[in-house]
From Swiss-Prot:
Protein family per UniProt: Belongs to the RapZ-like family.
InterPro entries membership: P-loop_NTPase (IPR027417), RapZ-like (IPR005337), RapZ-like_N (IPR053930), RapZ_C (IPR053931)
Role: Displays ATPase and GTPase activities.
Disulfide bonds: none
GTP-binding keyword on record: yes
UniProt protein name: Nucleotide-binding protein Dshi_0209
Amino acid sequence: MTDTAPTPEKMPQKIVLVTGPSGAGRTTAIRALEDLGFEAIDNMPISLVPRLLDGPPLARPLALGLDARTRDFSVTAVADLLHLLAEDPRADAQLLFLDASPRVLTRRFSETRRRHPLAPLESPMDGIARETDLLAPIRARADVVIDTSELSPHDLRAEMLRWFGDRDSLRLAITVQSFSYKRGVPQGTDMVFDVRFLRNPYWEDTLRRLDGRDARVQDYVSADPRFDSFFDNIASLVRLLLPAYREEGKSHLSIGFGCTGGQHRSVTVAEKLSAALVAEGWQVSNRHLELSRRSIGAQS
């Protein structure tokens, strides 16, 4: 039996060209595509785009941001690029055009106090009118047009997911870390749990030099009569919140467990929660801050 499934070398390179008037949300859209697994390149010279197809196949789809500030940008250059990509079997390209009403664009420029790139010495309204005329032929050729006039950044991210991703594409990267309260709570930790109420293996001579990755330490900590109830409630809370965070467009969540020394109890709970989440299909990485410091110190 012959395997006819396409090989990665034969799969066309997915490319989304993102353009639109200044202030319509192009940067937000590109960041959303990046969260969906795209490799994002903003303001790449148009003449260089075809060269991306000449190199080795890329593992991820491409999101390319183009606007009036892009080098060699013109209606003709964009039209030629679209024609070239449409004719090249190595490319699967779409043109996304983000738009907004002149009133909304004017308000956004006023709120940010930015100068319009096409009218740096004039009012934003002059630049908006000029850019609208310039981009009209490109808008007419777009595969997808999204009007962001009434969209919040969160709404725009949801639109990007609807058009260019699926629920599994918007992966939430989770970091579960242990730390010592002697050094304080790590910066950037979203959820913090204090596990110093659990019994401490430090006071057992046979466990003192071990850490929470060791099964003997985990068994000791788990034997605390309060452990099961505590862990089950924490795990249930995290399971409840993770889908909600993902739906809100959050791309990373950091969960921290702290104990006195950052060696036994916090490591144990972090290891167990990580294992439970990985078993459920979540993308999880572990960080044991105190253990890492000791490893570095031992090597230096």
